[in-house]
Amino acid sequence: MTAQTLYDKLWNSHVVREEGDGTVLLYIDRHLVHEVTSPQAFEGLKMAGRKLWRIDSVVSTADHNTPTGDWDKGIQDPISKLQVDTLDQNIKEFGALAYFPFMDKGQGIVHVMGPEQGATLPGMTVVCGDSHTSTHGAFGALAHGIGTSEVEHTMATQCITAKKSKSMLIAVDGKLKAGVTAKDVALYIIGQIGTAGGTGYAVEFGGEAIRSLSMEGRMTLCNMAIEAGARSGMVAVDQTTIDYVKGKPFAPEGEAWDKAVEYWRTLVSDEGAVFDKEYRFNAEDIEPQVTWGTSPEMVLNIGGKVPNPAEETDPVKRSGIERALEYMGLKAGTPLNEIPVDIVFIGSCTNSRIEDLREAAAIAKGHKKAGNVQRVLIVPGSGLVKEQAEKEGLDKIFIEAGFEWREPGCSMCLAMNADRLAPRQRCASTSNRNFEGRQGNGGRTHLVSPAMAAAAAVTGHFTDIRTMA
């Protein structure tokens, strides 16, 4: 039998029918639903007189539009409130395996809530009307975002039409240095292969450095796969995966658990499996990362300097650097560790899990917010993350440092709720995109790890966390 990649195994086990032109009908195991991309899909079902094909495949929450402060005042923005209320109504009418509404203890960012509830399991196909659905590939699952029409298609048929991507292996060999996190690994890889480097590929992350990551770290890495242009990102199943899933609310139990684990252990690429493309990186080369421009690929080690467009020979790239520097208000040659910040945001589906908050708290402990830093928002990814952080006293560390301890939600990752940047405000952010206007009109975003964000909060500028030990 031909050796198969993990992607081959996941894909082949879910093909319902081949259409003959490379297109297949692909079965979907888990459908994650939030308030932004579902209203039109539910409306389409109503107009056609259809029901959900499999109610027990749907797990839903509100996240993009929900405020992370002043919950006693409810949702103030009328459009945001309409979307959240509409989700409430649709779930009541159509049903779901689980629904975590606004202000429910289980509510949170869909890509944090799903895994912590055990709604994401190894071997599954997982879709959501959200580009960062690739997060769930950390479990040895095939996960990717879909458009609103595909959301309706999945609701009505439990299938989507799709074409198989090419396969890519990105291996990081060796051990990561102290202070280097999964976020740094993700940004480093994107800096090396570019935001189009993974276009057309399903990426498997491997190597010693990847296997050493926790599930939280693997989720961060797979979350960022889309920023390298990939359709999906994934990590093979191992004991770390199985230990994380065990005991979760929607995980199998008893004999079903034993059978599931037996199957899950097969979800690795076979020895001798051939990938369409491979990259290998040395963990020793990876330092804490900071983006300087308006694309995740515009990234450097913390010891670097803002690039000089005059040194770029490619006219298209040179123009891109010039535009980015103008938007970001930066001068060529400026050391990254001399760039001051106005706002710090620690949260998002990339970095709002308990491990992320622990890393940030370890840096913040015993320090105060720098005088030039206007606000530091700490936004846990879910009500359960918030509860755990408070049990550990992390909230007190943040509050004593002068940070804001918020309620769960997508928050300042995107300008879709009350948390947003003002024009020209510079933000150290643990989110996943630094596009122009992503966090607010005219806002300037620098992507970093939670520890690096906390360091910027207490020093007032980007700082190598390894100097703070």
Curated annotation (Swiss-Prot):
Pathway: Amino-acid biosynthesis; L-leucine biosynthesis; L-leucine from 3-methyl-2-oxobutanoate: step 2/4. Its cofactor is [4Fe-4S] cluster. Its EC number is 4.2.1.33. One of its GO terms (molecular function) is 3-isopropylmalate dehydratase activity. Transmembrane segments: none annotated. It catalyses: (2R,3S)-3-isopropylmalate = (2S)-2-isopropylmalate. Belongs to the aconitase/IPM isomerase family. LeuC type 1 subfamily. This is 3-isopropylmalate dehydratase large subunit.
